[in-house]
């Protein structure tokens, strides 16, 4: 939607008359000399906050974190589990009514305050638990994302072998079908194709066939356990080394902060598309690929009434855009105050969706070919859903490249590693920033080192034979639902408690543009109501989670709910803590005061802050005069505000 230019602001986003009332504005900031000095000292620190070298670096950084594993890894298997093409319709609807509004809101709040995901809650201090709860969910996501990096690195290393190890069957895999093309098998392995084909035909009548890429992943790489009732096993030493190397890379990138990440973002954001388009070009030429693409794109209208599909669409949108976790707020906080983020928000959200569709079409083209090779009647039968999909179907496609598949495999898994690094660096930077904001004397690189070491230790649980079970559990309880409920509190705290009009006034001051009706309606009604309805219904109809069509043991479900409780409890616990430590008369008065912006709320720069206070004061006086001059002025003003006029 268009944003209309406001005539009363300067080009830099500050009012043109901001220099006439400096002494009055200083008195408005604080009436206490000591408090005023403390705020000035804090403002000096914030004024010296590092900015991006240019706007393109910020845009590329947002692309690198939003266009990542969520698109190439999570979106295909989420669509796979929710009816293929049926998932696209709710996903696109959710994108426009929830994803884009939330993404734009987080960009705005970060740039306006120049603060991280916890410090922004000076807007509504008793909601500070939202920031800490999101940090908890971010830690959960980081731990299992890093295990995916370990798997990616493992595949990258073995891709240097003379023959891709997942492209052929082992003798002990009696239900195996080679992932490598038949004609290439004849060339590389001799005249054994007819015997293998005869064996496959015989087995297909009695046993479910599995591709060699799937069996390699399950039996060789993760050594998956079919049941975790007796424990998850011990970490695999090869994956442990890969996990350690991954965290070393993460630390080396993160220890320098955002100063150098903007330069790396060009490569992190653009390189993956080269490999993705090449893989797509190969995938669509495979036999059966059209059937897979049709399955992906053909909508099943009945699924639109399934609230679980809508819930998964919201969760996928959040994971894909990195909404509700903090990186977008953190990145935007390093922008100049007058940076035009509207364009960036639209570019990133649109590109993110197109990348998800690109990844989905590619993976389903491969699944269609797998179904053709395994003589499966239904594409859903060719491979199990779950986190292993990207490590089964993508390698299967790579093995079909007859011209130097090893080279393409190296490029692909390096691309996947780059995508993962881009995502985790942003998430990890969010955690390090939160800690450094609370303990300003701590060295950034030391905090980065400590958090990286903790991330490695926590990631060890995912490289055990039962690691994929734990990943599913943590993703569901520690990531999905915690992010979901805290995003509802985030939006309600900003739009309903602080107030839609107050928030839109702040946007107008910062951007020198009016906020259109689309954003106002989404923020005030459509986005929060949809999220609340979907969350309540999904919780009321929640079913015990499964992995590989098997239910978790009771202990697993209990652990999962405890994980969710810890994340969700951050909101009320920190709210109670703030109210208890900031008493203002009675309990009711203290609660009411905790819902009002603190003296720290507003732009970090002293000049922008003074201009903002004057801007808000002028608007309040103008609206009061309009309400007095017209009997229905109050209601007319409310209507104009909602319409963005």
Curated annotation (Swiss-Prot):
What's an example Gene Ontology biological process for this entry? sodium ion transport
- Keyword set, alphabetical order: Amino-acid transport, Glycoprotein, Ion transport, Membrane, Sodium, Sodium transport, Symport, Transmembrane, Transmembrane helix, Transport
Known Pfam families for this protein?
SNF
> What GO cellular component term, any one, is given?
plasma membrane
User: Mind listing the GO molecular function terms for this protein?
Assistant: amino acid:sodium symporter activity; D-amino acid transmembrane transporter activity; L-amino acid transmembrane transporter activity; neutral L-amino acid transmembrane transporter activity
Topology within the bilayer: Multi-pass membrane protein
Q: Which residues are glycosylated?
A: 191, 205, 514
Biased-composition ranges, Basic and acidic residues, are: 33-48
Q: Which PROSITE patterns match?
A: NA_NEUROTRAN_SYMP_1, NA_NEUROTRAN_SYMP_2, NA_NEUROTRAN_SYMP_3
Region (Disordered), start-end ranges: 1-48
Compositionally biased, Low complexity: which spans? 18-32
Q: Does the keyword Transport apply?
A: yes
Segments in the Cytoplasmic topological domain: 1-51
TM ranges: 52-72, 85-105, 138-158, 234-254, 264-284, 313-333, 347-367, 407-427, 454-474, 480-500, 522-542, 559-579
* The keyword Aminoacyl-tRNA synthetase is assigned to this record: no
Compartments annotated for it: namely: Membrane
Q: Which InterPro entries match?
A: Na/ntran_symport (IPR000175), SNS_sf (IPR037272)
Coarse class of the protein's main subcellular location: membrane
Q: Which PANTHER family match?
A: SODIUM-DEPENDENT NUTRIENT AMINO ACID TRANSPORTER 1-RELATED (PTHR11616:SF321), SODIUM/CHLORIDE DEPENDENT TRANSPORTER (PTHR11616)
Q: Which family does it belong to?
A: Belongs to the sodium:neurotransmitter symporter (SNF) (TC 2.A.22) family.
Q: State the function annotated in the UniProt record.
A: Unusual broad substrate spectrum amino acid:sodium cotransporter that promotes absorption of the D isomers of essential amino acids. Neutral amino acids are the preferred substrates, especially methionine and phenylalanine.
Task: Quote the protein name from its UniProt record.
Answer: Sodium-dependent nutrient amino acid transporter 1
Q: Which organism is it from?
A: Drosophila mojavensis
Q: What is the lineage of its organism?
A: Eukaryota, Metazoa, Ecdysozoa, Arthropoda, Hexapoda
The gene behind this protein is NAAT1
């Amino acid at each position: 939607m268009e944003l209309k230019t406001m005539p009363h602001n300067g080009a830099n986003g500050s009012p043109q008359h901001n220099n006439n009332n400096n002494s009055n504005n200083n008195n408005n900031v604080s009436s206490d000399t000591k408090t005023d000095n403390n705020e000035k000292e804090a403002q000096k620190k914030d004024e010296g906050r590092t900015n991006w070298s240019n706007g393109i670096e910020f845009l590329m950084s947002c692309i690198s974190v939003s266009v990542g594993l969520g698109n190439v890894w999570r979106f295909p298997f989420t669509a796979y589990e929710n009816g293929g093409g049926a998932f696209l319709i709710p996903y696109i609807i959710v994108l426009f009514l929830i994803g884009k509004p939330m993404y734009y809101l987080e960009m705005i709040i970060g740039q306006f305050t120049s603060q991280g995901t916890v410090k922004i809650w000076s807007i509504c201090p008793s909601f500070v638990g939202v920031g800490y709860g999101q940090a908890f969910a971010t830690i959960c996501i980081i731990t299992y994302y890093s295990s995916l990096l370990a798997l990616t690195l493992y595949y990258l290393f073995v891709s240097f072998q003379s023959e891709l190890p997942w492209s052929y069957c082992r003798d002990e895999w009696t239900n195996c079908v080679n992932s490598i093309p038949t004609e290439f098998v004849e060339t590389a392995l001799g005249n054994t194709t007819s015997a293998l084909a005869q064996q496959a035909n015989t087995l297909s009548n009695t046993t479910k066939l599995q591709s060699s890429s799937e069996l390699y992943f399950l039996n060789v790489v993760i050594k998956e356990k079919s049941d975790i009732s007796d424990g998850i096993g011990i970490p695999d030493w090869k994956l442990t080394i890969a996990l350690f190397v991954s965290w070393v890379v993460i630390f080396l990138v993160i220890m320098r902060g955002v100063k150098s990440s903007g330069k790396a973002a060009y490569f992190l954001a653009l390189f993956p598309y080269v490999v993705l388009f090449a893989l797509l070009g190969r995938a669509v030429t495979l036999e059966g690929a059209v059937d897979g693409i049709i399955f992906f794109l053909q909508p099943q209208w009945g699924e639109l009434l399934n609230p679980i599909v809508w819930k998964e669409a919201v969760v996928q949108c959040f994971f894909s855009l990195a909404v509700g976790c903090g990186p977008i707020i953190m990145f935007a906080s390093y922008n100049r105050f007058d940076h035009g983020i509207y364009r960036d928000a639209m570019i990133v959200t649109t590109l993110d969706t197109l990348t998800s569709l690109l990844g989905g079409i590619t993976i389903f083209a491969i699944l269609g070919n797998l179904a053709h090779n395994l003589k499966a009647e239904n594409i859903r039968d060719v491979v199990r859903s779950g986190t292993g999909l990207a490590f089964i179907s993508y390698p299967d496609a790579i093995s079909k490249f007859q011209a130097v598949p090893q080279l393409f495999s190296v490029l692909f898994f390096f691309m996947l590693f780059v995508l993962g690094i881009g995502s985790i660096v942003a998430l990890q930077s969010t955690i390090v920033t939160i800690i450094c904001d609370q303990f300003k004397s701590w060295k950034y690189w030391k905090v980065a080192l400590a958090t990286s070491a903790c991330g490695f230790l926590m990631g060890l649980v995912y490289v055990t034979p039962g690691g994929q079970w734990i990943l599913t559990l943590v993703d569901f309880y520690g990531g999905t639902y915690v992010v979901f409920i805290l995003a509802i509190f985030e939006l309600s705290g900003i739009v309903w408690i602080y107030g839609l009009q107050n928030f839109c006034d702040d946007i107008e001051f910062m951007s020198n543009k009016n906020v259109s009706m689309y954003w106002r309606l989404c923020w005030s009604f459509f986005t929060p109501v949809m999220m609340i309805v979907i969350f309540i219904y999904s919780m009321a109809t929640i079913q015990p989670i499964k992995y590989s069509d098997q239910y978790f043991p009771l202990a697993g479900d209990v652990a999962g709910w405890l994980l969710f409780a810890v994340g969700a409890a951050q909101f009320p616990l920190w709210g109670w803590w703030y109210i208890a430590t900031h008493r203002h008369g009675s309990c009711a008065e203290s609660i009411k005061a905790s819902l009002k912006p603190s003296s720290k709320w507003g732009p970090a720069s002293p000049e922008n802050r003074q201009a903002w206070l004057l801007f808000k004061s002028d608007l309040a006086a103008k609206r009061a005069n309009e309400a007095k001059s017209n009997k229905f002025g109050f209601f007319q003003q409310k209507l104009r505000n909602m319409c963005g006029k």
